[in-house]
Amino acid sequence: MTKRAMLLAILFSTFALTTQAQTITGAGASFPYPIYAKWASMYEKQTGNKVNYQSIGSGGGQQQIIAKTIDFGASDDPMKAELLAQHQLLQFPAIIGGTVPVVNLPEITAGQLKLSGEVLADIFLGKIKKWNDPAIAKLNQGANLPDKAIIVVHRSDGSGTTFGWTNYLSKVSTEWKETVGQGKSVKWPTGQGGKGNEGVAAYVSKIKYSIGYVEYAYAKQNQLAWASLQNKAGQFVQPSAESFMAAAANAQWESAVGMGVILTNEEGDTSWPVTAASFILLHKHAEKPEITKAVFDFFDWAFKQGKVAATELDYVPLPEEVIQKIQAQWKTEVKSSDGKTLWQ
């Protein structure tokens, strides 16, 4: 090969790499942010393609994908069927995890405190005001519970984590269901708000005798003590990938529009009661086909090569049969403006 030919080959390969590299943007739920950030870092190292994901809350993710200011949205609160239809959006699950109650009690270690759903609801209703309340003491006989006021911390932003939390409380407490209800944002009876899982974790970490709720990875990363919860079977369980997997084991993904299955208060002796899937949203009519294809490529890579990273962060990867259903939808439901299929 001549020097000129070698130079042309190098220039061509450099140009090819440059043109192939893609940057995609996503925003939404803070619940999956730790794993999405990890996946994005790994993906860029392996492929050169960038994924910029902003943790702004599920409400923001839904709003921005509707407004078409991002390439994909993320939400832990599955979008309602009428909105999916109105805005021609495809929704699919990407990861499974769990929300945990976290506490700042100097005498209590992770998993030591036991709470039932009813007691948890009464705490967040402001009815149980002190840590040594008889209802808590009954579940924790022999524990050194302080005679201190409980400081409740909740989310201040529109949040899929809040949706899952309030959905669970609505299932275990009639009073909660009738007075507060469920949603990405609710009128809290008591407490102070933190923005994102990050904000709630920071508040609980700093404020003694507080209680809040965060995705499990945030509890571990911030070295917060979590409570064990009594599940639907009456068993006290610890949060873990295994207990999240147990809750998701019998999920009927195709029973809900957009695969929007809710996994709170599921059956099973080992099921964690506040388990959730986190969902991805994108437009079915791809105005920028190459970008939509890049979104598919990223999540295809994550489903195949991101499982170990997900497990290390205590998330649960999707089962293979669910991935096959998702990718079948990519092929049939998402098209370019000229009707071409973007996923083969």
From Swiss-Prot:
Alphabetical UniProt keywords: Periplasm, Phosphate transport, Signal, Transport
Cellular compartments annotated: Periplasm
Gene3D superfamilies: Periplasmic binding protein-like II
Pfam families linked: PBP_like_2
Domain of life: Bacteria
GO biological process: phosphate ion transmembrane transport
Binding sites annotated in the UniProt record for phosphate: A29, S30, F31, S58, D76, S159, G160, T161
GO terms for cellular component: ATP-binding cassette (ABC) transporter complex; periplasmic space
Signal peptide interval: 1-18
GO molecular function, one term: phosphate ion binding
Family: Belongs to the PstS family.
Protein's job: Part of the ABC transporter complex PstSACB involved in phosphate import.
NCBIfam families listed in its UniProt record: 3a0107s03, PRK10918.1
PANTHER family named in the record: PHOSPHATE-BINDING PROTEIN PSTS (PTHR42996:SF1)
Subunit structure: The complex is composed of two ATP-binding proteins (PstB), two transmembrane proteins (PstC and PstA) and a solute-binding protein (PstS).
Annotated protein name in UniProt: Phosphate-binding protein PstS
Organism, as annotated: Pasteurella multocida (strain Pm70)
Gene: pstS
